[in-house]
């Protein structure tokens, strides 16, 4: 069947009417039979391993379990496409229809939807203008509610009555001289449905607008809240009584699968257990109503049905959580949808993509700002197609299979080819949450040992990253255009300024500031080798590396260049004349030797190996 392109502007989520829910699951077969209602709690027949008819995996309702084959086996093969078997009523089609065909359960008694009853705010309580506690008392069969007080002087509309009060009123109604006829009292979700049906939304909306104009403070805020809910119902053309369910949709069986394990046992989705509880209780309630069982038994069964539906929709929202084997709470429909591991965040918003990887980040201070350290293990996996292509093209490997074998064996040739492939091929690094465009940047990969991604410390502020266990994702741009775009627009060395403020975002912080401070700090406690003289800067560094001079020890180093020294007096602290006519002037941080006519012969600077290292690093960076 050709797929039709359906254009739409937006997706709207609204309340579904009972008719709409039936429509989702109901289908009419060519013989006129209407199917869709799930009436049996059975899943599959454990002898034949075929789905039970009218059960939770019924082939008549949801479609065939095997390709082009009906339940009884009368029709097999694709040539019978579209035929509905006269014997078993199963349409001969592909089993993938079991991923979207729905069913429904017709409830023997109305049930309140737990989202609208126990959600925050409780929309049922807001619409009825009753406290949530009172609404719960009605739904779970603890209190009666007055639906029609008629001419009784002591009763009011929506008033709650306990068992004793209702029995007292019943006695008054059935007394011989009584003129009380029209009094109506209800309990359970049926009573709630009646109250919601009696609501005239347009009238309520008008009345509330008048009341809001006259009131203020807390009362006004409460009225506005109620008006907003009523206006939303009017706007979406939904009816309040739809918050009480008469029909429950059954999601397609392939979305709640049952699979056979090696030992012959079955693993099943939690939803099947929850649906089974609902069907069992619903069937038992229908049977009790048929045989006109005592009211107290019927009422208890209705309460149990309400609790079963609550558990199916949102297990644990109210009352005891339904648990399965090992005391593990069963996963309800809400649990599947909500949260980080739910359908939206896990599968729809954040899909797994090919040519991507993820690992912990560690600092790579030896990297250039536009580079990142990519673990070899990760790189060979991400760049595999490029490596295979290069192997076949240049290294007399005949086919992909051969190339893959080389990769699996970790042949030394592979690493040389990988080095060639990644040269000039940028990768993109992303750290969640990506709050601005600098949350994903391009880097040139450098192969490193280990399993951690190395990141230049200066790009951390842009990613809001630190090295306490943060993870980052790597993505490989595949096409030439994507690579060019990554290099031109996204390379880290081109994203120096914040797009939001225009201020530099690549600023040294934390470890780098501490390192700079430590190199240049004064430390009177570490003065090993202090006072020594060195012919040049390299000699001083070598002495430090050999351990004969401390990092912070004050030493004299010959340096004939210009020296800027703040806080140093122009007048020397001492002047010493030598026999050869030369003069040595000693300042706070310098010692200069001059001829008689003032010509400089040599200059020694008082510094520390740490400061020499800092100076060399800055100079090298500026030159390159």
From Swiss-Prot:
Pfam families given in the database record: RNA_pol_Rpb1_1 (PF04997), RNA_pol_Rpb1_2 (PF00623), RNA_pol_Rpb1_3 (PF04983)
EC numbers for this chain: 2.7.7.6
Reactions catalysed, as given in the entry: RNA(n) + a ribonucleoside 5'-triphosphate = RNA(n+1) + diphosphate
GO cellular component, as recorded: DNA-directed RNA polymerase complex
Enzyme class: transferase
Keywords for the protein's UniProt record, in alphabetical order: DNA-directed RNA polymerase, Magnesium, Metal-binding, Nucleotidyltransferase, Transcription, Transferase, Zinc
Coiled coil feature spans: none
The record's free-text note on cofactor binding: Binds 1 Mg(2+) ion per subunit.
InterPro entries given in the database record: DNA-dir_RpoC1_gamma, DNA-dir_RpoC_beta_prime, RNA_pol_asu, RNA_pol_N, RNA_pol_Rpb1_1, RNA_pol_Rpb1_3, RNA_pol_Rpb1_3_sf, RNA_pol_Rpb1_clamp_domain
Record-listed Mg(2+) binding positions: 466, 468, 470
An annotated GO BP: DNA-templated transcription
A molecular-function term among this protein's GO annotations: zinc ion binding
Family note: Belongs to the RNA polymerase beta' chain family. RpoC1 subfamily.
Subunit field text: In cyanobacteria the RNAP catalytic core is composed of 2 alpha, 1 beta, 1 beta', 1 gamma and 1 omega subunit. When a sigma factor is associated with the core the holoenzyme is formed, which can initiate transcription.
Function according to Swiss-Prot or TrEMBL: DNA-dependent RNA polymerase catalyzes the transcription of DNA into RNA using the four ribonucleoside triphosphates as substrates.
Protein name as it appears in the record: DNA-directed RNA polymerase subunit gamma
UniProt gene name: rpoC1
């Amino acid at each position: 069947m050709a797929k039709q392109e359906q254009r739409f502007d937006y997706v709207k989520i609204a309340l579904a009417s009972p008719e709409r829910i039936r429509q989702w699951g109901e289908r009419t077969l060519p013989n006129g039979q209407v199917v869709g209602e799930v009436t049996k709690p059975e899943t599959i027949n454990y002898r034949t391993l075929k789905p039970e008819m009218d059960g939770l995996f019924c082939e008549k309702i949801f479609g065939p379990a095997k390709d082009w084959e009906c339940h009884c086996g009368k029709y097999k093969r694709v040539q019978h496409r579209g035929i509905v078997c006269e014997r078993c009523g199963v349409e001969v089609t592909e089993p993938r229809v079991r991923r979207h065909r729905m069913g429904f359960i017709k409830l023997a008694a109305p049930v309140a939807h737990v989202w609208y009853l126990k959600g925050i705010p409780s929309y049922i309580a807001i619409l009825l203008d009753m406290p949530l506690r009172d609404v719960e008392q009605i739904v779970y069969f603890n209190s009666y509610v007055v639906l029609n007080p008629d001419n009784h002087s002591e009763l009011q509309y929506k008033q709650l009555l306990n068992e004793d009060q209702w029995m007292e009123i019943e006695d008054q109604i059935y007394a011989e001289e009584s003129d009380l006829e029209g009094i109506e009292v209800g309990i359970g979700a049926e009573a709630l449905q009646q109250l919601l049906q009696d609501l005239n939304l347009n009238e309520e909306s008008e009345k509330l607008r008048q009341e809001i104009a006259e009131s203020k403070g807390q009362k006004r805020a409460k009225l506005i809240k109620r008006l907003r809910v009523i206006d939303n119902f009017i706007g979406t053309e939904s009816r309040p009584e739809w918050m009480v369910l008469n029909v429950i949709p059954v999601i397609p069986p392939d979305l709640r699968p049952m699979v056979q394990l090696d030992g012959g046992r079955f693993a099943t989705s939690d939803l099947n257990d929850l649906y089974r509880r609902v069907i069992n209780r619903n069937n038992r309630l229908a049977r009790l109503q048929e045989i006109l069982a005592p009211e107290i038994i019927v009422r208890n069964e209705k309460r149990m049905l309400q609790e079963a539906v609550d558990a199916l929709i949102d297990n644990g929202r109210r009352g005891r959580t339904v648990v399965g084997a090992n005391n593990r709470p069963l996963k309800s429909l809400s649990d599947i949808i909500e949260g980080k591991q739910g359908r939206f965040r896990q599968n729809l918003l954040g899909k797994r993509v090919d040519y991507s990887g993820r690992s912990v980040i560690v600092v790579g201070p030896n990297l250039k700002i536009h580079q990142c350290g990519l673990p070899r293990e990760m790189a060979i996996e991400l760049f595999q197609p490029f490596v295979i292509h290069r192997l076949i093209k240049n290294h007399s490997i005949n086919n992909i299979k051969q190339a893959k074998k080389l990769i699996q064996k970790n042949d030394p040739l592979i690493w040389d080819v990988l080095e060639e492939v990644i040269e000039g091929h940028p990768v993109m690094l992303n750290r969640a949450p990506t709050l601005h465009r600098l949350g994903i940047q391009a880097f040139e990969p450098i192969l490193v040992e280990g399993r951690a991604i190395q990141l230049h410390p200066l790009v951390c502020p842009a990613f809001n990253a630190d090295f306490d266990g943060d993870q980052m994702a790597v993505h490989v741009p595949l096409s030439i255009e994507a690579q060019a775009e990554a290099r031109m627009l996204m390379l880290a060395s081109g994203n120096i300024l914040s797009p939001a403020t225009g201020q530099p975002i690549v600023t040294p912080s934390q470890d780098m500031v501490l390192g700079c401070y430590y190199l240049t700090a004064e430390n009177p406690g570490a003065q090993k080798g202090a006072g020594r003289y060195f012919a040049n800067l390299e000699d001083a560094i070598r002495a430090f590396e050999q351990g004969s001079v401390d990092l912070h020890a004050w030493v004299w180093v010959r340096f004939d260049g210009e020296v800027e020294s703040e806080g140093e007096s122009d007048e020397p602290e001492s002047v010493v004349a030598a026999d050869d006519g030369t003069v040595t002037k000693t300042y706070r941080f310098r010692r200069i030797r001059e001829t008689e006519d003032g010509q400089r012969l040599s200059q020694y600077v008082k510094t520390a190996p740490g400061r020499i290292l800092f100076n060399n690093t800055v100079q090298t960076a500026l030159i390159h």
